[in-house]
Amino acid sequence: MKFLEKLKQAGNSHNSLLCVGLDPDPKLMPVGMTALEFNREIIAATAPFVCGYKINLAFYEALGKQGWEILSETCKLIPPELLSIADAKRGDIGNTSKAYARAVFDELGCDGVTASPYLGYDSLEPFIEYQDKGIFILCRTSNQGSADFQMLKTEYLGQKRFLYEVVADKSLQWNRYENIGLVVGATQQEELKKLRLSYPKMPFLIPGIGAQGGDLKATVENGTNQSGQLALICASRGILYARSGSEFAQGAAEAAKQMRDAINHYRKRF
């Protein structure tokens, strides 16, 4: 199944654009619980309300030698009809990039990955060549320092363009398999709206809701296409740690349902 088709089916199956981040933080998890146990309960509790999960590889790498095993087992827990996105932000050249692609797609079996365009097309090609997998290219990110480079103006095709605009245009040029999307932060509403109008057929992975302060209503209005689709709206801490202690899973389920329903409320305009 092509990635874009699975993305649409995942959203339709649970009537959801919500993508929950699986970022297990030992400081916030229930005392004595392993990351794998935590993820298992989170997935079981939230799966009815989401279109997929975004797995931030850094949280597993930080767990040491057992981290990869926990990561691998976590990926297996995700229901097959839902998306699994490896938030890896990879970007390297040659055999290194090929190895990264094999690790994410062949070993972990993820449906998609986040990647950095800074090294150019040859650093992304090994991912793009997995024609049934999705590649979300960092474009206009949600962090405070993102403007350091992304808002620089450069000469492009005879015009002065922001660097993030060049990234978006290049991403479209590379999208011959229709498996490329953009990472656009919910904290960047002006650019989110502009990019959606310019690229109505590309999926957007949209972090920055919740702890980073992104506005949910504006994100739905600016980040979805004319059919109210093609957006994966990400939330992590606000879902995972909605409650503490033994009620964490129930709290996550309630928070996920509430956010899914809020997103759908704002989608009613479509």
From Swiss-Prot:
SUPFAM superfamilies: Ribulose-phoshate binding barrel
Keyword vocabulary terms for this entry: Decarboxylase, Lyase, Pyrimidine biosynthesis
Entry annotation: catalytic residues: K89 (proton donor)
Superkingdom of origin organism: Bacteria
GO molecular function ontology, one term from the record: orotidine-5'-phosphate decarboxylase activity
Top EC class of this enzyme: lyase
Chain ranges passing through the membrane: none
Reaction it catalyzes: orotidine 5'-phosphate + H(+) = UMP + CO2
EC number(s) recorded for this UniProt protein: 4.1.1.23
Record GO biological process: 'de novo' pyrimidine nucleobase biosynthetic process; 'de novo' UMP biosynthetic process
Pathway terms, separated by semicolons: Pyrimidine metabolism; UMP biosynthesis via de novo pathway; UMP from orotate: step 2/2
Record-linked Pfam families: OMPdecase (PF00215)
SMART domains, alphabetized: OMPdecase (SM00934)
Recorded family membership: Belongs to the OMP decarboxylase family. Type 2 subfamily.
UniProt xrefs under PANTHER family: OROTIDINE 5'-PHOSPHATE DECARBOXYLASE
Protein name: Orotidine 5'-phosphate decarboxylase
Provenance organism: Dehalococcoides mccartyi (strain ATCC BAA-2266 / KCTC 15142 / 195)
Lineage summary: Bacteria, Bacillati, Chloroflexota, Dehalococcoidia, Dehalococcoidales
